[in-house]
């Protein structure tokens, strides 16, 4: 029986382990962490015949030196860097290393896939696309880097019609060449450079997905994609929220907004007022989803039904409540400066902004300029708080406080809204969550809980 070692006991690693076990592999799992939650998962998997090691860093040389069996294959979760020394050594030793998306693709390649990637906008576009396909009667779950992993979907007994998958750069770097029916690219700004090293490497990872797709759909409003990708895939479809004239020059295949209508190849398709979510960025997500559905043969009236019933996704400009006549908004999904800028631009000022976490590389200047324009106060949390305080001081913004934790920040915001004419309290961190939380969802859930307790 072939053996496989799965590294990472997150949702994707657990699902990959179970799927491989079902397919006849002898599976073992490891994770470098040890927490009560992981110990519970360890007990569940071991009851299913899958041994789990916690507080363990996989190392090939250690296995060899103590005479333990070397696995025939290694499968990694998205959080495990592709270029880590242990994985480099494994590949040099001839051991195949794959990501969990590769396991899912191997299982579900007979189905049509819609794959969505990009720096920002992936989650909303994925969820909206799935909502439209489901309105058409398809079993088409949203999965991947959103909610259920793709391997979790592969484990379900119910027959699938489509796979609607959000795929991150972390997942793509460990994936084989995929051949989806549709590949969508939402936006491109520098992100995850601490993982990929350079912008070129980050772009190449994203482009990897487009190369095998039957239909490529690109965001023509995104400056980087317009400048660098126009001739990359000659048969690609482009979208724009700013009319046909705003499509890249020489593009024959376009879907755009003009006169409050979505136009497809100069033919009106459906009105824009059916979209409930605010902001131009959400119009871009809307066009990408509509273009996909239309090209897949879904009628316009069904697309409109799916869009009209879609209110947005948790943690992305999610309205929690109105308290003291102030809107409290959860934007925990804003894990970089560009997403945080979009979030701040989308709400009504004056704003109390709660920001911070684990800082990323990137250009924070547009975000800081908007803070000067719209924020009455900034409350800083997490590892990045001292760094952000210095950046705010550098632009002459002094209405900030270092709060360290989200509990303290929400309590301070609740006090400030009684003293100033605030319209919105916005939690839009501009940072990763891993300094204080397992993921952005846990962070956003905590913010929601704190708001509802006011």
From Swiss-Prot:
The keyword Ligase is assigned to this record: yes
GO BP term, example: cell wall organization
EC code: 6.3.2.9
One annotated Gene Ontology cellular component of this protein: cytoplasm
InterPro entries assigned to the protein according to its UniProt record, in alphabetical order: Mur-like_cat_sf, Mur_ligase_C_dom_sf, Mur_ligase_cen, MurD
Keyword list, A-Z: ATP-binding, Cell cycle, Cell division, Cell shape, Cell wall biogenesis/degradation, Cytoplasm, Ligase, Nucleotide-binding, Peptidoglycan synthesis
Pathway recorded for this protein: Cell wall biogenesis; peptidoglycan biosynthesis
Molecular function GO labels: ATP binding; UDP-N-acetylmuramoylalanine-D-glutamate ligase activity
Annotated residues for binding of ATP: 118-124
Reaction catalyzed: UDP-N-acetyl-alpha-D-muramoyl-L-alanine + D-glutamate + ATP = UDP-N-acetyl-alpha-D-muramoyl-L-alanyl-D-glutamate + ADP + phosphate + H(+)
Enzyme class: ligase
Compartment(s): Cytoplasm
Location, primary (coarse class): cytoplasm
Function: Cell wall formation. Catalyzes the addition of glutamate to the nucleotide precursor UDP-N-acetylmuramoyl-L-alanine (UMA).
Name by which UniProt lists this protein: UDP-N-acetylmuramoylalanine--D-glutamate ligase
Top-level taxonomy: Bacteria, Bacillati, Cyanobacteriota, Cyanophyceae, Acaryochloridales
């Amino acid at each position: 029986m072939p053996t496989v070692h799965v590294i990472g006991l997150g949702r994707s690693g657990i699902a990959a382990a179970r799927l491989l076990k079902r397919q006849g592999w002898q599976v073992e799992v490891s994770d470098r962490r040890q927490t009560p939650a992981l110990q519970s998962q360890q007990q569940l998997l071991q009851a299913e015949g899958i041994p789990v090691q916690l507080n363990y860093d996989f190392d090939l040389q250690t296995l060899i030196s103590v005479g333990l069996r070397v696995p025939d294959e290694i499968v990694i979760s998205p959080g495990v860097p592709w270029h880590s020394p242990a994985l480099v050594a494994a590949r040099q030793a001839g051991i195949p290393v794959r990501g969990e998306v590769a396991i899912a693709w191997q299982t579900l390649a007979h189905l049509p896939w819609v794959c969505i990637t990009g720096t920002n906008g992936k989650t909303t576009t994925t969820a909206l696309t799935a909502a439209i396909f489901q309105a058409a009667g398809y079993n088409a779950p949203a999965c991947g880097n959103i909610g259920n992993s793709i391997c979790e979907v592969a484990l379900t007994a119910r027959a699938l019609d489509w796979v609607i998958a959000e795929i991150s750069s972390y997942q793509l770097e460990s994936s084989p060449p995929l051949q989806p029916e549709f590949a969508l690219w939402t936006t491109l700004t520098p992100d995850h450079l601490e993982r990929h090293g350079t912008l070129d490497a980050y772009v190449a990872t994203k482009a990897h997905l487009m190369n095998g797709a039957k239909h490529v759909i690109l965001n023509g409003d995104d400056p980087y994609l317009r400048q660098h990708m126009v001739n990359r895939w000659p048969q690609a479809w482009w979208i724009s929220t700013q009319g046909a004239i705003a499509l890249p020059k020489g593009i024959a295949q376009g879907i755009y907004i003009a006169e409050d209508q979505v136009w497809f190849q100069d033919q009106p398709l459906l009105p824009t007022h059916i979209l409930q979510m605010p902001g131009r960025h959400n119009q871009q997500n809307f066009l990408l989803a509509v273009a996909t559905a239309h090209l897949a043969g879904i009628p316009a009236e069904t697309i409109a039904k799916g869009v009209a019933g879609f209110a947005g996704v948790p943690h992305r400009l999610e309205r929690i409540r109105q308290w003291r006549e102030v809107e409290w908004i959860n934007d925990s999904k804003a894990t970089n400066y560009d997403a945080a800028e979009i979030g701040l631009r989308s709400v009504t000022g004056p704003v109390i902004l709660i920001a911070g976490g684990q800082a990323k590389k990137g250009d924070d200047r547009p975000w800081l300029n908007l803070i000067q324009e719209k924020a009455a106060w900034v409350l800083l949390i997490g590892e990045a708080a001292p760094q952000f305080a210095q950046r705010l001081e550098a632009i002459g913004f002094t209405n900030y406080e270092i709060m360290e934790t989200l509990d303290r920040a929400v309590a301070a915001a609740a006090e400030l809204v009684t003293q100033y004419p605030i319209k919105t309290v916005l939690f839009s961190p501009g940072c990763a969550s891993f300094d204080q939380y397992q993921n952005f969802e846990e962070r956003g859930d905590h913010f929601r809980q704190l708001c509802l307790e006011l």
